[in-house]
């Protein structure tokens, strides 16, 4: 009888622990990553990062405690009221920079080879951009608050072409452009 009570108590404790852990993990995953918001003070784009650990810590106690961990306007405006958090609460997925970029790449093709970019692999071979000066860039080279301007002026580039163009730019003496030479046939006449 006592063993059954201990077993039931252990199951209840584990269930509550699982619910609290689940709530914390959900909040952490929901609020991690760099986001693009319109600064209420300047009406300009600003890159912000929510303190996802704090959000995860406060989620199990029933309050969604959001605060900024970083902002592109800091340290000058570090004491702002953080009113931009309202934009994140109302549309957490829409302001995530990764999602903005994913939507922009949808249906686009590489400016060099014409290959459809398809689903983006953000961990391995992510696509790049070509600037108006015909220089390819990776996303980590562009400040997040500049994304709206960059998306209007740059063209999509697949990973393979980005690597080839970077090699061509960095090592021009080692690059041989064979596209202008006629192809030789390997078939015997």
Which residue ranges define each predicted feature?
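Short cysteine-rich clusters marking metal-coordination/redox-active sites
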Residues: 39, 68-71, 110-113, 158-161
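Feature marks short, highly hydrophobic, charge-poor N-terminal signal-anchor/signal peptide-like helices
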Residues: 1-10
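Short functional micro-motifs and their immediate structural scaffolds
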Residues: 44-47, 76, 89, 115-118, ...
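Transmembrane-cytosolic junction motif
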Residues: 15-44
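Short cysteine/histidine-rich metal-coordination sites, predominantly Zn2+-binding motifs
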Residues: 52-63, 86-93, 98-103, 125-139, ...
């Amino acid at each position: 009888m006592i063993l059954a009570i201990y077993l039931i108590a252990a199951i209840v404790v584990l269930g509550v622990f699982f619910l609290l852990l689940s709530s914390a993990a959900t909040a952490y995953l929901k609020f991690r990553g760099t986001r693009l918001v319109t600064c209420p003070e300047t009406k300009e784009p600003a890159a912000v990062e929510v303190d996802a650990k704090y959000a995860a810590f406060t989620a199990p106690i029933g309050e969604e405690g959001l605060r900024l961990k970083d902002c592109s306007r800091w340290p000058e405006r570090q004491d702002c009221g953080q009113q931009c958090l309202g934009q994140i609460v109302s549309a957490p997925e829409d302001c995530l920079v990764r999602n903005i970029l994913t939507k922009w790449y949808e249906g686009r093709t590489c400016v060099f080879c014409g290959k459809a970019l398809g689903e983006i692999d953000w961990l391995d071979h992510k696509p790049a951009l070509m600037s108006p000066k015909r220089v390819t860039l990776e996303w980590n080279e562009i400040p997040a608050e500049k994304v709206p301007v960059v998306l209007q002026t740059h063209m999509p580039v697949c990973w393979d072409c980005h690597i080839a163009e970077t090699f061509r730019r960095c090592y021009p003496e080692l690059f041989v452009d064979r596209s202008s030479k006629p192809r030789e046939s390997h078939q015997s006449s």
